[in-house]
Amino acid sequence: MDSNTVSSFQDILMRMSKMQLGSSSEDLNGMITQFESLRLYRDSLGEAVMRMGDLHSLQSRNGKWREQLSQKFEEIRWLIEEVRHRLKITENSFEQITFMQALQLLLEVEQEIRTFSFQLI
């Protein structure tokens, strides 16, 4: 995994956890949790690609991995929409920068997961 991506995830998660968005802090915590889950999933897919022999163990361990992959893409799309919405409504420059970087990272991760999945298919 790219070390820049790891630090980007960590940086964005740290900054998002410091944000106070009033009544929507519960939503923000949900976004943070999904970001972390997405990072772990992307990492595990990347590791499986690196050990191409793991394709069979990945498939046998999780017979529904294509369904899981589809679910992750849905989560990414939801997060992208949520981040775009937050970006539109916030006037705080710190939050704007954080959400712009989160959006960029989500788009990069979506592309990485897509690339990994094509290699595994």
UniProtKB/Swiss-Prot annotation:
The Gene Ontology CC terms held by the record are: host cell nucleus; virion component
Q: Any idea where this protein resides?
A: Virion; Host nucleus
* Organism encoding this protein: Influenza A virus (strain A/Mallard/Ohio/556/1987 H5N9)
Highest taxon in the source lineage? Viruses
Motif interval(s): Nuclear export signal: 12-21, 85-94
Another remark in the UniProt entry says: Average number present in a viral particle is estimated to be 130-200 molecules.
Q: Is the keyword Transport assigned to this protein?
A: yes
Q: How does it assemble?
A: Interacts with protein M1. May interact with host nucleoporin RAB/HRB and exportin XPO1/CRM1.
Instruction: From the UniProt record, report the name of the gene that encodes this protein.
Output: NS
Q: Keywords on this record?
A: Host nucleus, Host-virus interaction, Transport, Virion
Query: Which Pfam families would you find in this protein's record?
Result: Flu_NS2
Q: Name one GO biological process term.
A: exit of virus from host cell nucleus through nuclear pore
- Record's keyword annotation contains Metal-binding: no
InterPro entries, alphabetically?
Flu_NS2
Major localization class? virion
Name of this protein? Nuclear export protein
What does the similarity note say?
Belongs to the influenza viruses NEP family.
Any idea what job this protein has?
A: Mediates the nuclear export of encapsidated genomic RNAs (ribonucleoproteins, RNPs). Acts as an adapter between viral RNPs complexes and the nuclear export machinery of the cell. Possesses no intrinsic RNA-binding activity, but includes a C-terminal M1-binding domain. This domain is believed to allow recognition of RNPs bound to the protein M1.
